[in-house]
Amino acid sequence: LFGGLLDKLKEKIKKYCNKENLDKACSKL
């Protein structure tokens, strides 16, 4: 259950990073 929440959070972060083009901050993910 907790792992599923982490996956959803990562997906949100990836989408935000793609939209904002924050390559340096998002390359860590």
From Swiss-Prot:
Tissue/organ expression: Expressed by the venom gland.
Cell compartment(s), UniProt: Secreted
Any one of the GO CC terms: extracellular region
Keyword set, alphabetical order: Disulfide bond, Secreted
Disulfide bond found in the keyword field: yes
Major site of localization recorded for this protein: secreted
UniProt miscellaneous comment: There are 6 heterodimeric myrmexins which consist of a small subunit (SS1 or SS2 or SS3) disulfide-linked to a larger, quite structurally unrelated subunit (LS1 or LS2).
Homology family: Belongs to the myrmexin family.
Record's function text: This heterodimer may have anti-inflammatory properties, since the myrmexin complex (composed of 6 SS-LS heterodimers) inhibits carrageenin-induced edema in a dose-dependent manner (after subcutaneous injection into rats).
Subunit: Heterodimer composed of subunit SS1 and subunit LS1 (U1-PSDTX-Pt1b), and heterodimer composed of subunit SS1 and LS2 (U1-PSDTX-Pt1a); disulfide-linked.
UniProt-recorded name of the protein: U1-pseudomyrmecitoxin-Pt1 subunit SS1
Organism: Pseudomyrmex triplarinus (Ant)
